[in-house]
Amino acid sequence: MSAKTSVDTIWHIPDDLWSLIAPLLGPEKQPGTRGRKATPYRLAFDAVVYVLRTGCQWRALPRSEYAPASTIHGIYRKWVKAGVFAKAWKLLLAYYDDKLGIQWKWQALDAAITKAPLGGEATGPSPVDRGKSGTKRSLLTDRRGAPLAMVVTAANTHDKVVALETLDRIIVERPEKLIYRIHHLCLDKGYDYEDVIAGVLARDYILHLKKRGKADKPIDGEKKHPARRWVVERTHSWMNRFRRLLIRWEKQVENYEALLHLACVLILYRLVASAAN
């Protein structure tokens, strides 16, 4: 089975991306063990991407293309427990930084709510869906939309509650603010609270914040430094193209977060590939 050259295809991982991820997965079969031949990890990884991209149930994985669904899901759970997808996200962000450079100067933070009809960890009544079960992802991106940090909470968690936690969850080391290295942070009016503002300023950001009740008025300094709040909204839109993320079916939050992290991996790879083309 040959790998395609772009993540625009549905489920095959490109060779160069696989070469980065494969070392994180460990041996397919423990040395000295007997029994049937192990399922190739590349095949299993492609199957996980298939689920992420198509949104199908695990049991609906085409067996003729991959392996029994129970086998694939077992390998996936093993990787989740080992933190493989979080490590892959961190690795791809470092790869993105090496190829293009993280654009720290302009960052944007916003949250999005997703339906979670089965409930589970980090779910709650959605304020935008008549109190039905939902989950929220709080996301921080750089100027291009590269995902830098993410926090998953219940849908009824106020944005301001997880804003500072999201800033503190950046998965690579953030450069110190210097005179020639200024960081701007763009927020919408949902974050217009004194504790959030104080926390953002304490983290050495120049804040661009739409004020509640003044949404149509320009922010001081925005003619010189126009805010880029739309960037993080676009990344949320990119994530929603992965059909498994449109509705959360995972009860355990670690399983859901792993799929989000894999989406971040593919988004970062696409940003680098697009720049190269």
What is each model feature region?
Residues 1-277:
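Short alpha-helical elements
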